[in-house]
């Protein structure tokens, strides 16, 4: 779910 921060 780190893609949300990109």
Curated annotation (Swiss-Prot):
Changing residue 3 to A: No longer induces msrD expression, reduced ribosome stalling. It comes from the Bacteria. Induction: Induced by erythromycin. The keyword Transcription applies. The modification N-formylmethionine is found at residue 1. Coiled coil: none annotated. This is Leader peptide MsrDL. It comes from Streptococcus pneumoniae.
